[in-house]
Amino acid sequence: MNKMERQQQIKRIIQAEHIGTQEDIKNHLQKEGIVVTQATLSRDLREIGLLKLRDEQGKLYYSLSEPVATPFSPEVRFYVLKVDRAGFMLVLHTNLGEADVLANLIDNDAIEDILGTIAGADTLLVICRDEEIAKRFEKDLAAGL
């Protein structure tokens, strides 16, 4: 089996199972007759670009980092002037008096990975489920500036 076929198998396993460790991936591969070293598996996972996310119970699992549509409505980008991130929190800067409007838009979008928002006059704090999600949202919002 070549590298490309092996990486396709890894992607298939990740999509089909809720897997949290490289050891679990390695065991799934072995069940399918594919033997890999830890170094090869680590390299494959890095090349595939897997994300490690948390589920509702707080357990880590691997997820494909396939591009997904933006979770934000187009109106959200209209109000954002600047995006900063501190760990799992985003700070969105707006014009004076627009932060509460932006908070309402984000809250109405009901994005599962956003736990809540707190608005000031021109600054909005967005609390994300974890740091990886905050990074993804930061990148998404910054791309629209």
Swiss-Prot record:
Q: Which GO terms describe its biological process?
A: L-arginine biosynthetic process; protein complex oligomerization; regulation of arginine biosynthetic process
Q: List the disulfide bonds.
A: none
Database matches in InterPro entries: Arg_repress (IPR001669), Arg_repress_C (IPR020899), Arg_repress_C_sf (IPR036251), Arg_repress_DNA-bd (IPR020900), WH-like_DNA-bd_sf (IPR036388), WH_DNA-bd_sf (IPR036390)
The compartments listed are:
Cytoplasm
Q: Which GO terms describe its cellular component?
A: cytoplasm
GO molecular function annotation:
arginine binding; DNA binding; DNA-binding transcription factor activity
Name where it mostly resides.
Answer: cytoplasm
Q: In which pathway does it act?
A: Amino-acid biosynthesis; L-arginine biosynthesis [regulation]
Its domain of life reads Bacteria
> Keywords assigned by UniProt?
Amino-acid biosynthesis, Arginine biosynthesis, Cytoplasm, DNA-binding, Repressor, Transcription, Transcription regulation
Would the keyword DNA-binding turn up in this protein's UniProt record?
A: yes
Q: Which family does it belong to?
A: Belongs to the ArgR family.
What role does this protein play?
Regulates arginine biosynthesis genes.
HAMAP family (alphabetical): Arg_repressor (MF_00173)
Record-given protein name: Arginine repressor
Source species: Streptococcus pyogenes serotype M1
Upper taxonomic lineage: Bacteria, Bacillati, Bacillota, Bacilli, Lactobacillales
